[in-house]
Amino acid sequence: MAIKRCPASIDVVEAAKIRIRNVFRNGLPVYMSFSGGKDSLCMSQLVMNLIQTGEIDPAQLIVQFIDEEAIFPCMEEKVREWRKKFILVGAKFEWFCLEVKHYNCFNELSNDETFICWDRYKKDVWVRQPPSFAIRDHPLLRPRIDAYQDFLPRLCTAGITITGIRTAESVQRLQNIAVMLRAGKSMTNKHQVFPIYDWTNNDVWLYLLREKVDIPEIYLFLWQSGTKKGQLRVSQFFSIDTAKSLVKMNEYYPDLMERIIRREPNAYLAALYWDSEMFGRNT
């Protein structure tokens, strides 16, 4: 599919602000997906600035964080900081620690590509403990059956969801959003808006720098270990993007690999084959 890019008369930051203001003007609850990663930090700073200038109502805002258990310590720390910020300005922050299915690249060989976050039958080997204030269950959730992508849409039907998805992340995302934009008004049937969809990687890092937003230190560690700027992605440990960097991060988090292997025995594959075709490298 051919995709035509149209230049705008305003910069991407101002465009994102306009989109966010328009969402809040509907008067509906606004659900914001939050991960603690660079894109969601940009979204959060944009929203926080608009709250502080009185341009949007924080009482409409419900921030949602799906805690996938296997996350870096600095990511949890950053999410805690932002949880406090949002609560202090009058927004609601939902921190979910749920038994949801997640993709597990280490289980490809056994034909089982799922991982159950916060598995009740594996409490003794959880990578970390959930916060005391976390939401551990929900009537709309089908535990151990749903992925969070199944659960959240059911939870957010009463409002509009804003998410920090960007077309620069992948060709697939570019094509998907192009199709949605071409659909015109029908795209709103999904109740989703992507305020920073047109931001480049440079836009993201420049905005975080100019706004003096603290980022999780894992990004600095990845950069120091030789990861290219366009590949600075952080997700749950058993996703392909993060799995291939686990061995490098063992230098910065000495006990982390041990805890990961205890939770997911096949994770030893990362130590043996991280620089091979298994993790996207052709050597």
Features from the language model and the residues they span:
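Nucleotide-activated chemistry modules centered on ATP-dependent adenylation/adenylyltransferase
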Residues: 1-31, 38-283
